[in-house]
Structures are given as structure tokens and as C-alpha cells.
Amino acid sequence: MATVTSNASPKSFSFTVSNPFKTLIPNKSPSLCYPTRNKNHHRLGFSIKATVSTPPSIATGNAPSPDYRVEILSESLPFIQKFRGKTIVVKYGGAAMTSPELKSSVVSDLVLLACVGLRPILVHGGGPDINRYLKQLNIPAEFRDGLRVTDATTMEIVSMVLVGKVNKNLVSLINAAGATAVGLSGHDGRLLTARPVPNSAQLGFVGEVARVDPSVLRPLVDYGYIPVIASVAADDSGQAYNINADTVAGELAAALGAEKLILLTDVAGILENKEDPSSLIKEIDIKGVKKMIEDGKVAGGMIPKVKCCIRSLAQGVKTASIIDGRRQHSLLHEIMSDEGAGTMITG
């Protein structure tokens, strides 16, 4: 969701990303390539297929004309200008991790955003994969207050799955889509230092972020790489901890002075009425969302997500959005349209 306005007539559209520019613009737009890539990196591009309710020629199922594709691309210009060169931290999880179609959508969105000059950073968890491996090893998964109880054996599996499997798979997918990703965890370059959560006696090796040192990330994003970060880190003694990925994303966004924090979730966003999906709140400030928590309108698993957003905003992040990760190309809808794809929280 952005506050940019365009003079073009409003349309309802969705993006399908493909490779490269030659299907849309005959590779004559160097400004739409990585500005910081060295000469050895190839040029990236994208085309956009629009599915709209008007004009009738599109509604009939005919392929959009080249002119119409260019029109849709030109409507993205104000949003590209607004966010070009800005850091966007995205937390990836939920249904978007288990559906191949949604996973492909997230990856292509990240590549497109990087191609037009944004600086995306991806933070991920991996609950479904962890649960599957625990089941294969006949280790029961246990949760308390939404947090995974993590003993020493479980912690070893969490690290193995998040860092060794999920992270590297995402890096490979992003690379295959045309960008260059670098896989990291909180351990690398002392990016994150963990500490145990207050109720660690009940939860085991579940941690929270004690410190962030983003110096290892800055040269990566400066040179056009997409960092992909697994949400595990160690304390000062070297003990590994499992950290909530929302928390990691929020703390990284704050440390980097990000323009935007985006949490992909399995809900439409923040609802005025939890029982009514049509009551989505498009935009709300910190004061308003705190009042919703007090009134019980924000409850359950949404509370830690909202608090994560509030904390990041209080530390200088411009906006934080909770968006519907079940929707294909929700990242593009959130950043490249006024409508957005969920709820944007402002300071």
C-alpha cells in the first residue's frame, strides 16, 4: 500500500512476472536494471500481464495488447519513483511457504522489485518444514502461547531445516528467477545476537533479539544482492536460539532504517470485525491499533504481529504492513498500488 497517486484512470489489475524486458520493452531501459550491479552481472527485466474487468476486449479472454501492457507499466512509474533505492524488509511465512504457486509469486515479486531499484530483504521461518522433519523423526511438536517449545534436539533440527534447507531453497529459487540472492542466518557476521525469552524455563531455546549489527547486510544490498535470512541466532556464549521470524524482520527493519516492513500472513489483514472478512482496515495509525488491542478487536496470533509492527515504527521504520500472503503477487499489490493488499500501520 502506498500513498502515491497517479493521473491514470483507476483499474483493478494483477501482475504476472516473466523474464525478461524483451517481451514488453525491447531492452532499452537501463534505468530499470540494477543500478549497482557490476559489469559482469546480466541485466534483469520483467513483463506484466494485466487481468482487468475493462476494457471489454480484455474481459473476453483475449491477450492484452502491447499498448495496454505499456500503459500498465507506465502507471507503475510513480510507485517505482517513490520506492527506488529504499529498503523493504519482507517476512515470508504461512501459506505462501507451502503453496508452490504462492512461493513462485513471492520470488518473482522480489526479483521484480529489485530489478526496478528497490532493496528487498527477505526474512523467513519454516514451521511446516520443521514439523515435517520432527514427524519423520518421531519427535512431537509442542507449542505454548503460539511459540514452539524448543529443547536441544529440536533446536538442532530447527537450525538444520531453516538454515540448511529452507534458506538455500529460497536462494536457489531467487537465483533461478534472475536475481542474485545470498543466504544468511543471525549467526553470520554477528547479524543478530539472541537472548532467551523471559519464560525460557517453559519454552527452552526460544529467543528474542538482543542486538542487531546490520553491517554485513549493507554491502550486499548496495551491490544489488537480495539477502535471505533464516530466523535463528546465538547468544554471546554461542548457544543457538529459535527466534520468531516476525520479530527478526521487525528488528532488522528498524536497524536498517527501512522504508517499509511487510509481514506476509494467512489473513487479509487487520479486521474491524474478526468474523467479517469484508471489514478489512486498509490503514491505521499506532494509536488506533493500540485501541483495537485494548478493545479486544485484535487478538490471538495477530497481537504479536501488530506489536512487532508498532515496535519497528517506533524505531524509525516509515510504514509497516500486514498483508494477505494467500493472494498471488500480494507484494506487488502492496507496493505498486494505492489499494494495497492488507493493512498498513503508520506512526
UniProtKB/Swiss-Prot annotation:
Binding-site list for N-acetyl-L-glutamate: 126, 148, 242-245
Localization annotation: Plastid, Chloroplast stroma
Family: Belongs to the acetylglutamate kinase family. ArgB subfamily.
Transmembrane helix recorded as keyword: no
GO cellular component terms listed in the entry, alphabetical order: chloroplast; chloroplast stroma; chloroplast thylakoid; cytosol
EC number: 2.7.2.8
NCBIfam families, A to Z: argB (TIGR00761)
Modified residues (N-acetylthreonine): 51
Keyword Transferase listed: yes
GO molecular function, a single term: ATP binding
Record: transit peptide: 1-50
Keywords annotated in UniProt: Acetylation, Amino-acid biosynthesis, Arginine biosynthesis, ATP-binding, Chloroplast, Kinase, Nucleotide-binding, Plastid, Transferase, Transit peptide
Reaction catalysis annotation: N-acetyl-L-glutamate + ATP = N-acetyl-L-glutamyl 5-phosphate + ADP
Organism: Arabidopsis thaliana (Mouse-ear cress)
Binding-site residues for ATP, renumbered to this chain: 94-95, 265-266, 271, 297-305
Activity regulation behaviour: Inhibited by arginine. Inhibition is relieved by binding to GLB1.
Biological or metabolic pathway of the protein: Amino-acid biosynthesis; L-arginine biosynthesis; N(2)-acetyl-L-ornithine from L-glutamate: step 2/4
Pfam families (UniProt xref): AA_kinase
Stretches of the chain forming a coiled coil according to its record: none
Residues at which L-arginine binds: 260, 282, 334-337, 342
Protein purpose: Involved in the arginine biosynthetic pathway via the intermediate compound ornithine.
UniProt-listed GO biological process terms: arginine biosynthetic process via ornithine; L-arginine biosynthetic process
Encoding gene (name): NAGK
CDD domains registered for this protein in UniProt: AAK_NAGK-C
Subunit (UniProt): Interacts with GLB1. Interaction is dependent of MgATP and inhibited by 2-oxoglutarate, arginine, glutamate, citrate, and oxaloacetate.
Protein name (database record): Acetylglutamate kinase, chloroplastic
